[in-house]
Amino acid sequence: MKRVIAYVDGYNLYHGLKSKGWKRFYWLDIQKLAQQFLKPDQKLVKTRYFTTVVKQPDDKRRRQTVFLDALKTLPDFTIHFGQFLSEIITCRVCGHTYTTYHEKMTDVNISVELMTDASQDRFDIALLLSADSDLVGPVKAVQRLFPAKRVIAVFPPG
């Protein structure tokens, strides 16, 4: 039986679903989603979910917290947190300033866990659910350093 670890870019998945207008899928069972991509000779041994806690508005943060609390009840499921960095933007037309937030560290966290798991022989196959091109380098590194291991990319909608 081949061991599979799923690496899920939660931010990327959410925004892919949102861009398609697929709100009904926001509350996915992430492990069941990952299992849909397995072959009969493969076993999901761990799911790593990468996200960043929403800062504002409060209602979005509350909904995300409830979702993350539900995910924490799943066996062999780990949540890895990045962060949002704030940036003050000034409108070129009217001069109004506002704060915007940029998600940071998700791709770095995925890269670190992917390389750590590969080097410690925790998987035979890595299932990478993300469309982030910043992960091409780490995927190539795993393929180069651990040629017996496979990395399968699954792209979220959007």
For each of these PLM feature ranges, what is it?
Residues 1-100, 150, 154-157:
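Domain-level signal for Mg2+-assisted phosphodiester chemistry and nucleotide/NA-binding surfaces
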Residues 78-158:
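Nuclease catalytic cores that cleave nucleic-acid phosphodiester bonds
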